[in-house]
């Protein structure tokens, strides 16, 4: 509901979220108070509500000053050592399996030289991923060398790489964090998603890390209609063991575009709300303007043949930035092709300019929108609808938390 230019109200439960778009701020007020605001009878509001409007600058029409994000070499690089995988998840966006063995992959020496180049270019963190990195027989050597170079190191594995305790200890001594894929604490439900035997692989790895005292463990849990019933039980397991987790529906990319395992809109909303509520820090912050999802600004990915992409979910020609055999990273990020990244924000995306949520969502995940619309500037309205519901839920939750402090 539009109250005036750049001031909107959204019903939530029995109250109203009052949102100043340009200031990216919001209090929660009663429906009765909203009527007074609509009539501009501010003096008739309670003293506490008047204070809310002042503190949250609800009546200001001046936009916040936004520092322009200049495209420079991001500080985090994802290094996909292989696209081979010993699992066959029904929703895998990369369609990884044991046949994904590309010709002319980067050699042992080239990976070492790449790590040195990343260090020299100012990259701070490398995250080794796949496929399953445990299938690259030199993965431990690359991780060790990155650590010796002084880079912060992380990895993503289905558990294969840490299946042996000596490997788990070796990695715990060198990695800042490790991310493991586990969809459910229920073995049958997990393996319906990821394939027979996957539960044991993941749990063995998690137990090995916990046994040696490594606790900076993250879990990626993907929810489909196969494992929806065990979500709460799975969350409880993560909490009991001090494991951070990311919970979400699968992306309709790769095998996920063909899988008949989708959640309904309401199921997705419930899962995403649970995931956002569990995050260590809120994904919304008052008085913060978000103009993009961060595509190409915070991270990039290099695949097994040296191709460089702006996002690990967007290994397509439209988002390819170059190849490390042909281009130096510094040259790529000074090249005119980086104009692509600069255009991936709400000022260039279809329909975003008139949406009241634009500075809160930043246009949403570009990968999701791209694969739904096949357009680098496209926007999928169903994704927008879901994100708006999640934003309202978090706006309300954040406000209630501030009221209690």
Which positions does each model-derived feature cover?
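Short, small/polar residue-rich loop motifs at catalytic or cofactor-binding pockets
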Residues: 13, 293-297, 318
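N-terminal [4Fe-4S]-dependent radical SAM core
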Residues: 2-28, 45-78
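Canonical Radical SAM [4Fe-4S] cluster-binding loop centered on the CxxxCxxC motif
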Residues: 70-72, 76-108
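C-terminal accessory region of radical SAM enzymes
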Residues: 214, 252, 260-288, 313-362, ...
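Radical SAM/AdoMet-radical enzyme domain recognition
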Residues: 108-129, 136-250
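Cysteine-cluster motifs in flexible loop/terminal segments that predominantly coordinate metals
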Residues: 346-393
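Short loop/turn motifs at secondary-structure junctions and domain boundaries
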Residues: 71, 290-294
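Short Fe-S-cluster ligation motifs
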Residues: 114-134, 343-344, 378-405
């Amino acid at each position: 509901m539009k109250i005036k230019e750049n001031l909107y109200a959204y019903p939530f439960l029995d109250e109203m979220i009052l949102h100043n778009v340009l200031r990216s701020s919001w209090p929660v007020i009663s429906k009765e108070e909203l009527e007074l605001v609509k009539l501009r009878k501010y003096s008739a509001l309670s003293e506490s509500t008047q204070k809310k409007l002042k503190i949250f600058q609800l009546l200001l029409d001046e936009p916040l000053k936004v520092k322009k994000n200049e495209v420079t070499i991001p500080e985090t690089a994802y290094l996909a050592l292989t696209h081979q995988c010993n699992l066959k998840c029904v929703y895998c966006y990369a369609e990884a399996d044991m046949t994904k063995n590309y010709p002319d992959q980067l050699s042992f020496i080239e990976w070492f030289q790449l790590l040195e180049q990343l260090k020299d270019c100012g990259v701070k963190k490398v995250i080794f991923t796949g496929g399953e990195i445990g299938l690259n027989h030199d993965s431990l050597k690359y991780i060790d060398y990155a650590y010796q170079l002084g880079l912060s190191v992380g990895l993503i594995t289905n558990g294969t790489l840490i299946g042996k305790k000596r490997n788990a200890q070796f990695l715990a001594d060198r990695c800042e964090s490790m991310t493991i894929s586990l969809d459910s604490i229920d073995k049958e439900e997990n393996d319906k998603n990821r394939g027979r035997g996957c539960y044991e692989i993941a749990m063995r790895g998690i137990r090995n890390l916990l046994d040696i005292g490594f606790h900076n463990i993250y879990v990626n849990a993907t929810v489909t209609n196969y494992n929806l019933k065990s979500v709460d039980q799975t969350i409880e397991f993560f909490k009991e063991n001090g494991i951070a987790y990311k919970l979400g529906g699968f992306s309709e990319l790769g095998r996920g575009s063909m899988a008949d395992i989708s959640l309904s809109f309401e199921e997705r909303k419930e899962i995403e709300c649970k995931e956002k509520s569990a995050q260590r820090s809120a994904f919304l912050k008052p008085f913060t303007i978000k103009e993009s999802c961060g595509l190409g600004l915070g991270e990039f990915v290099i695949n097994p043949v040296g191709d460089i992409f702006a996002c690990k979910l967007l290994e397509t020609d439209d988002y390819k930035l170059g190849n490390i055999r042909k281009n130096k990273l510094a040259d790529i990020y000074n090249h005119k092709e980086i104009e692509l990244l600069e255009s991936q924000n709400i000022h260039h995306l279809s329909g975003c300019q008139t949406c009241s949520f634009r500075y809160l969502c930043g246009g949403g995940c570009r990968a999701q929108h791209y694969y739904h619309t096949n357009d680098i500037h496209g926007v999928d309205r169903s994704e927008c609808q879901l994100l708006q519901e999640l934003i309202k839920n978090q706006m309300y939750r954040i406000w209630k938390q501030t009221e209690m402090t």
